[in-house]
């Protein structure tokens, strides 16, 4: 999926917005169903549960957190956006930090990542590790990635791993 985006004048990555280009025909209306519907429901607060997690109760879930200082040369693209793959890498680092020794060879079976925002080079981010569950050779966890400076949500991830 591709989109054209722009930043507001002087706003950096905190002000990124999707834009339409006059030279291109309008995009086809999105088909509702599947991931598009799931994403819309999550962002609007209508999705109550995902991967077995109560989405309305993040603050009450057992939480640990650590901060990451992304490297401008490795984690950002030429336009100054944090790479989507870096988000996933930070989730894997959180798993390794909080649970890795128990699951050194874990294999990802499913992962849904919902992106909400971005950061500028030089900003730190926080990964919150929420209510991991283990059982029957599986590890399921939810992570929130937040801008460390103001707590703004950057992404929400749900992962199922074989351990």
Tell where the protein language model's regions lie, with residue ranges.
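Hydrophobic beta-strand-centered segment that forms part of the acyl-chain substrate-binding groove
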Residues: 94-135, 154-162
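A general secondary-structure signal for short beta-strands and their flanking turns/coil
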Residues: 61-65, 124, 138
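HotDog/MaoC-like acyl-thioester-processing domains
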Residues: 1-39, 121, 131-163
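Beta-strand secondary-structure signal
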Residues: 67, 126-128, 140-142
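Hot-dog-fold acyl-thioester-processing enzymes
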Residues: 8-109
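Residues in well-ordered beta-strands of folded domains
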Residues: 2-5, 69, 114
